[in-house]
Amino acid sequence: MARISAHVIDAIADRVDLVSLVGNYTHLERRGDDWWGRCPFHHERTPSFHVVPDKKMYYCFGCGVGGSTIKFFMEIEKIDFHEAAVRLAKRAGIEMSFEDGVHAPSAHASFTMQLCEVYQRIAETFHHVLMHTAQGARARAYLASRKVTDDSIRTFKLGYAPPDPVWLFQFLRHKGYSPEFLARSGLFAKKSERIAVFSDRIMYPIADRYGQVIAFGARALGTAPAKYLNTADMPQYKKGEHLFAFHCALSQMRKTRAAIICEGYMDVIAFHQAQLTYAVAPLGALLTKSQARLMRSFVDRIYMCFDADGAGRAATYKAILLCRSLGFEVRIVELNGGTDPAECACIEGEDALRKSVERSTTDAQYLIRCARHEHSHLGADDTSRAVSFLFPYLSVLDSAIQREQVMQDIAMAFGIRIQAVHADYLRYVSRTTQKGTTGNCVLSVQGTAIQVKEPATGVRTAQLRLVLAVVANPELFELLRESVCADDFEDPMAKELFIILEECYRADTRASPHVLSCCTTDELRKLVSEAIVCGEFSCNAPQIVRDGVALVRRNRLLKERESLVGRLRRFGDASSGEECGSMQELMMEKQRVDEELERLKGVRK
């Protein structure tokens, strides 16, 4: 693959605002010249993720991840360097160029970008059909009957797929898309590649956090066998990693530090029309860990509003455990008569939705009520079974005080002593611990979610510290290179880093992003990121480098002296004139080394 030219990497670093980019994934707050937030790569309560705009670098003191603008985008989007650079350059309006003048993107990257393009195009086309054509009249009437406003149709880019199942194939062929590409696009039936998956349906575009359409949900208007259809997982879309309307809700999520999670597209729209514009929906039956973590950096409180039927209660229970394990506060929104939010808004008005959120209950109150409902169908001897329903919830609470309070509420609700609840809970914990597993899939999430890794920066030798000081202060590299060379370094990472700095110096690309892009291991990248961001070498760097250079030179001279002494010993008592001459040369060389070592002592003092 062609190597991206250095000036493009420089342009990305200069023109892509790292604070804004990171801000799409976690909430940042300014402290002095830098920005801090919760790390988007691991679960944490106290912000330890540090962004330094003037150095165009980030670093997490909790898990040790760090790097440049391109590195962040690579890691957060799970793509390679080439694709990350191309996508960032496109977003910033930077013309791509390559060292050999040839751009050869990977087949996967090219296919993914083409998929995003075609999904965005047809979302706009479906929206036009809905809003401005006679074919869309029936769909407009349906949405009006559900009290969906024109403003909401525009906000969510709702559309209508015409009833002719061949129309979309012909439309896209006319736009220049090949039959081979369309067959792989996820838009057409596998057994009949001209037949559209979506026809005669209300279309709900699913977008990523930037508003780029990547998939569709669809509701049939006619008598189709499947009332609802959704895009299958594709290279650009994994349903368990996205939330419907996340890009629309993100701004208000940041302001309120809250999110409403409901079940369906129409439920989300109903909440937004009620000015509760921080509502989103999972794209499946259950909220996933990836979806919950998507909100974690922006949200402290989750309002859950799932259906009141058995499946809805089960989904609520699992979502509570998951969100609690990730540190969210959770409240439950319950609607009158067991209606869903869209029905509630239609029947009782938008104010009813707002009031339902205001009177939401805690997750503990909700679960205790569910347990008591279960107890009402059991015999008196089965109270323990109903109470044990709550033990997984107790396990995901990270506060002992909170856990004790919930135990008191359980005891009061069931008319039993708190000591009995506590004893049964301890037995439950003991059993799950002995098995080496929690016995509950969501409890196992807890162990992963709250684990915070120590930075894997390893032990830093004096040589490595010297080179890291130069990495953090690249203007000092000339001072380093005029005194030492790569072979003077015994530490392998220090040697590798010196070689990288030398290559960047010769290419006149000593900026941090270039140094990072040349690092061959994650450990070295973490060391470099930490050195640049942490500020350890921001004070007295020239003296650190001078002392380090003196130490490297001293080690080199000591090795040279040891070699000379060994050679002198081998001469023994020189007899011939030639041997005497050679021995004299070695002694003079040793004297020179000794004098140099004495001078270095003076420098170090």
From Swiss-Prot:
PROSITE patterns: TOPRIM
EC number: 2.7.7.101
CDD domains reported for this sequence: TOPRIM_DnaG_primases
Residues that, per the record, bind Mg(2+) 2: 307, 309
Cofactor binding remark: Binds 1 zinc ion per monomer. Binds two Mg(2+) per subunit.
UniProt: Mg(2+) 1 binding residues: 263, 307
Signal peptide, first to last residue: none
Catalytic reactions on record: ssDNA + n NTP = ssDNA/pppN(pN)n-1 hybrid + (n-1) diphosphate
Subunit and partners: Monomer. Interacts with DnaB.
Membership in a protein family: Belongs to the DnaG primase family.
Role noted for this protein: RNA polymerase that catalyzes the synthesis of short RNA molecules used as primers for DNA polymerase during DNA replication.
The protein, known as: DNA primase
Organism: Treponema pallidum (strain Nichols)
Gene responsible for this protein: dnaG
